[in-house]
UniProtKB/Swiss-Prot annotation:
The gene is MT-CYB. GO terms for molecular function: metal ion binding; ubiquinol-cytochrome-c reductase activity. It comes from Iguana iguana. Its cofactor is heme b. This is Cytochrome b. One of its GO terms (biological process) is mitochondrial electron transport, ubiquinol to cytochrome c. Belongs to the cytochrome b family.
Amino acid sequence: MTVMRKSHPILKIFNNSFIDLPTPSNISAWWNFGSLLGLCLIVQTLTGLFLAMHYTADISLAFSSVAHICRDVQYGWLIRNLHANGASMFFICLYLHIGRGLYYGSYLFKETWNIGVVLLLLVMAAAFVGYVLPWGQMSFWGATVITNLLSAIPYVGATLVEWVWGGFSVDNATLTRFFTFHFLLPFTIIALTMLHLLFLHETGSNNPTGLNSNPDKIPFHPYFSYKDLLGATLMITTLLTLVLFSPNLLGDPENFTPANPLITPPHIKPEWYFLFAYAILRSIPNKLGGVLALLFSILILMIVPLLHLSKQRSTTFRPFSQTLFWLLISNVLILTWIGGQPVEHPFIIIGQLASVTYFTLFLVVMPTTALLENKLLNW
């Protein structure tokens, strides 16, 4: 008799995805981030659901309703801080997951990779509209500045901005629709995550060597289920430490002031996880140019598979490409730092140089180095 998990129509899908899944025996801890992202998504959806039960999407009540959640709702402070800092954990895991993909050549699974890039864009959209909901100063001005970027689109820009705002400025209509989007997007993200997994399981996972894994695979459970459990424990511990000891560490003090259209904060800046893109946006003196650079700073990931000119998949055995990879990481960290600084000398020129370096590494230096390494293989 076949085991029920192998024959039942629904359990069979679960079994083939999480229990009897053939997995490369040598995948390292860098392969843990997929499951950690799944965990983040579950935590964010559940905490978000409970917050939505008490939140009011109205400009006269939004700020007060968040204060009410933190003061009067049972464990509301915990739910709110888990949700706010859970977003940071989500992005940490996302960036590490993408970094892993770039380092080990996982992007050659094109469908999986491109769905992943779309997922990144959706998570960024969800985080942006979510940041507006508490209706603090930085929420309001962040929404104003970022939505205003749409006005850079030729011909339809101005109309588009008014359409997104639902009026002639960021107002009640804007808050209401942002709450709608913030509620809707996670479910779209969950659906795409399933597709992401579906395409991944068509090919199987890559591994640190970049070689074919088929000769040496082991069942996902118990080996990697326990490995994932360890990763999950470490992540939850980190998240709880942040939430319980320093919940406002990554937030902006400006957001403790209710939104006021008449007072502009001295430095308008997004949450830390958007700072690298914000720095690229600001480094270009032209509005439309900045918006395009901002867009391409993320969309460039979609053409990475086309720019892979090396005969080897992973950078494990390519010291030159490894050096460039870490240069890229350093560059993104510099951009993140610049994004949080005021627009003045020397930050302007540093941001411009880092932005040029970012695109040059992806489009020119890395592919050229890959070709050079191919030549070296023949020596």
